[in-house]
């Protein structure tokens, strides 16, 4: 800590920045030391996976690549064919983002129009007007 306190920063003139302070003083910039400039070290990347850095095990393909028998299946769909046809037909347009966005905008706009058309017009206080007669203040004024 004591060695850090002894280091002082001397003002250095930087071309083009000398008049940047309001009082016209030069900016104080610490000169880079030889220690702070380091070249990047070339080192091999080492990643450890499992025991003895084994990345791919030909003897245990199931744990290396995943359980394809559990998730990948060539069996036909267990759902009703009519149900599958319905979802393939009517959900196909919504697989595209643009069509889904248009559907949501039209649905939201129509909902907003319906709610605003069916709203009661006298909800705002300015439309209702005063509900009670005004009470006079402390000096008898309204």
Curated annotation (Swiss-Prot):
Subcellular location: Plastid, Chloroplast thylakoid membrane
A Gene Ontology BP annotation from the UniProt entry: photosynthesis
The entry's keywords: Chloroplast, Membrane, Photosynthesis, Photosystem I, Plastid, Thylakoid, Transit peptide, Transmembrane, Transmembrane helix
GO cellular component, one term: photosystem I reaction center
InterPro entries referenced in this protein's UniProt entry, alphabetically: PSI_PsaH
Pro residues bias locations: 131-142
Disordered as annotated region, ranges: 122-142
Residue span of the annotated presequence: 1-48
Transmembrane intervals: 99-119
Pfam hit, one: PSI_PsaH
Membrane topology: Single-pass membrane protein
PANTHER family per UniProt: PHOTOSYSTEM I REACTION CENTER SUBUNIT VI-2, CHLOROPLASTIC (PTHR34787:SF1)
Function: Possible role could be the docking of the LHC I antenna complex to the core complex.
Family: Belongs to the psaH family.
Protein name according to UniProt: Photosystem I reaction center subunit VI, chloroplastic
Organism encoding this protein: Zea mays
Gene that this sequence comes from: PSAH
